[in-house]
């Protein structure tokens, strides 16, 4: 159980980092694509907060202690939308990989599996969307 809680806490910290990164990028994006990407980054920040809530609930369900701080991986500060999209791709790919690992660990809990599988699908969709934006 501790291994699952630890992995979920990793996902939670990553979602908190993603929310911070996307909010930061929405504020700083410049250039001809600013309006489209500002909206995109704001939506991703909101999605990350929602994912964090679901992951936190899963940790509570397992009687674990949820982290309150974001993952410490550096957030690249830039106003260049191309770099922002590259960083977003790295973030979404890592998130999808992490959720895939968790899904392999929780196959016996249908409710939790379904909730986290939906997040995995959201992350995979984000990767595909970023491929089209890049």
Regions found by a protein language model. Give the residues of each.
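Iron-associated oxidoreductase/ferritin-like identity signal
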Residues: 1-134
